[in-house]
A protein has these predicted regions:
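Hard-cation-handling environments
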Residues: 239-321, 339
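Short, Lys/Arg- and Gly-enriched loop/turn segments at beta-strand edges
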Residues: 31-39, 59-61
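Conserved Radical SAM active-site core
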Residues: 56-58, 67-208, 219-248
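Redox- and metal-dependent alpha/beta enzyme cores, enriched for Fe-S-associated oxidoreductases
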Residues: 307-362
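Flexible glycine/acidic-rich beta-alpha junction loops that bind and position SAM and/or redox cofactors
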Residues: 192, 209-236, 256-278, 352-359
Length: 362
């Protein structure tokens, strides 16, 4: 933990209050400051009383500002603490399937609830302490993005490669009861958490009133030597996943007004099924997980296209994309050609020789 101030934003409330670099932030409004969540939450109010220390001397400074405005303090790290590293050994971990000799940041496995809230990273909650869990409830830290994968405790532990992973399911239940908004994901691995196990997971999440959850197919690269044997989601499996998700989605729509469960675009592409209409995505609440990216792109593309004159003749172009998205991009190009008769362009599907042909999205 490091709450020593390293810099202060110019013209910020903290600068106006006379706070100086090198002081350590101990408390805000009587609350002990451990990390960035404490700093953000307790520093939100228009009046912030800061207890500071430097060279063995303490002082109190009152900062007045607009509600919600940042105090303007900066610390050695973004989190003001060490990042929580992943303690799991997931059967499907994509980082474990990376090629060697890449840049170091590609091999970092974070599993930090603070990064989930602040940056949208996904967390399994398996390394969450009781204090951290209770803080999420007490401060109503929401939304957070949670990797669920399965609600059968034994299967959950197996998929995450962590004998103690069951406690994360208890955290999920507690957070649901406390009204914490959670966006979840299920990485579907054929033969593991599909079929009846998937039904159980969706049934449990419905019962717990989990906010929303995306279903995505497992990604398998050509670098799986020494790892658990997995098989990709193929056409029939993708169709079954979509059918199960739709069954529970329709039930949730009838009972709660939200479908709750959303299938990634990649599943529809693998299933050979048309993408859902825009209202399926409920405002694209799971778009960061590949749910609705193509439909959103199409809507934005068509809207932008109609702002141009039909006789426009842009320079010739080529769109390079993965093999999965190539048919859809070709579909967009055909719509553009119908509107711009002089348009000259092509779509090129690129095989992923680098990490494996089974990684075909772009």
């Amino acid at each position: 933990m490091s709450t020593v101030i390293t810099s202060i934003d110019p013209h910020s409330p903290a600068e106006r209050a006379g706070i100086t670099v090198g002081e350590q932030l101990l408390e805000i409004n009587g609350h002990h400051i451990v990390d960035v969540l404490d700093y953000r939450f307790y520093g939100y109010d228009p009046v912030a009383v800061l207890r500071l220390a430097k060279d063995g001397q303490e002082r109190t400074v009152t900062v007045r500002k607009e509600e919600g405005r940042d105090l303007g303090l900066n610390f050695p790290t973004y989190l003001m603490d060490e990042m929580h590293q992943c303690a799991n050994h997931c059967l499907f971990c994509f980082v474990d399937q990376m090629p060697p000799h890449m840049r170091p940041s590609l091999y970092i496995k974070d599993d930090d609830e603070r990064l989930s809230f602040l940056l949208g990273n996904y967390t399994t909650l398996t390394n969450l302490s009781e204090r951290e869990a209770q803080r999420i409830i007490d401060l109503h830290i929401s939304p957070i993005n949670v990797s669920v994968h399965a609600t059968d405790p034994q299967l959950h532990c197996t998929l995450l490669g962590n004998k103690g992973a069951e406690r994360s399911l208890e955290y999920i239940r507690r957070f649901c009861q406390a009204g914490i908004v959670m966006n979840g994901q299920i990485v579907v691995c054929p033969g593991w958490n599909d079929g009846d196990q998937l039904r159980r997971t969706l049934r449990d999440l419905t019962e717990w009133q989990f906010s929303s959850c995306s279903l995505v197919p497992v990604g398998i690269t050509k670098y799986r030597k020494g790892l658990a044997r997995l098989r990709p989601v193929e056409k029939d499996c993708a169709r079954e996943i979509i059918t199960i998700a739709e069954e529970f989605g329709q039930e949730n729509l009838r009972r709660y007004g939200t479908r709750r469960f959303f299938c990634a675009d990649e599943l529809f592409l693998r299933a050979g099924l048309p993408l859902p209409e825009e209202d399926y995505y409920e405002g694209y609440r799971q778009i960061e997980n590949g749910v609705g990216m193509l439909r959103s792109l199409e809507q934005e593309f068509l809207s932008a296209m109609k702002l141009e004159e039909p006789d426009a003749a842009p320079s010739p172009f080529t769109i390079a994309t993965g093999t999965a998205a190539a048919p859809f991009m070709t579909h967009l190009l055909e719509q553009a050609r119908a509107y711009f008769p002089a348009l000259r362009g092509q779509v090129i599907a690129v095989e992923n020789d680098f990490i494996g042909h089974t990684i075909d999205v772009a």
